């Protein structure tokens, strides 16, 4: 037997679980219109750089594909993880009216990362003294 205090909440639980999935409505109203600077998918991919313009055939030059596809779909299309994350970040920025521009890849230091830099520098100097 179901206690009386839970029984009045049970139909609400059923009603919410049987509702249409939220994923279907996820990006329906958040697809921005193309601007003068970014009129189509090809221009968007050229503007963000990092050789993303090679993927214009993947998006089929369709503005809706660019803003509706998630990481799972891009993975199925064969886009590598670094470009997927980068494109989705730039799409998110454009959707939120933030400026989009190319973010250059970082360059590794000759002496390694920040944590071990002192050790590598000391080792390199010791080798060069001899």
Curated annotation (Swiss-Prot):
Where in or outside the cell it occurs: the entry states: Mitochondrion
Q: Does the keyword Cytoplasm apply?
A: no
**Keyword Mitochondrion found:** yes
Coiled-coil-forming residues are none
One GO cellular component assignment for this chain's record is: mitochondrial inner membrane
UniProtKB keywords: Mitochondrion, Ribonucleoprotein, Ribosomal protein, Transit peptide
- What residues span the transit peptide? 1-27
* GO BP annotations listed: mitochondrial translation
Q: What is its main location?
A: mitochondrion
Listed GO MF terms:
structural constituent of ribosome
Entry's SMART domains? IGR (SM01238)
Q: How does it assemble?
A: Component of the mitochondrial small ribosomal subunit (mt-SSU). Mature yeast 74S mitochondrial ribosomes consist of a small (37S) and a large (54S) subunit. The 37S small subunit contains a 15S ribosomal RNA (15S mt-rRNA) and 34 different proteins. The 54S large subunit contains a 21S rRNA (21S mt-rRNA) and 46 different proteins.
The record makes one more remark, namely: Present with 2630 molecules/cell in log phase SD medium.
What PANTHER family is this protein classified in? Answer: PROTEIN FYV4, MITOCHONDRIAL, SMALL RIBOSOMAL SUBUNIT PROTEIN MS41
Q: Which family does it belong to?
A: Belongs to the mitochondrion-specific ribosomal protein mS41 family.
What is the documented function of this protein? Component of the mitochondrial ribosome (mitoribosome), a dedicated translation machinery responsible for the synthesis of mitochondrial genome-encoded proteins, including at least some of the essential transmembrane subunits of the mitochondrial respiratory chain. The mitoribosomes are attached to the mitochondrial inner membrane and translation products are cotranslationally integrated into the membrane. mS41 is involved in telomere length regulation and required for survival upon exposure to K1 killer toxin.
Protein name per the record: Small ribosomal subunit protein mS41
Q: What is the lineage of its organism?
A: Eukaryota, Fungi, Dikarya, Ascomycota, Saccharomycotina
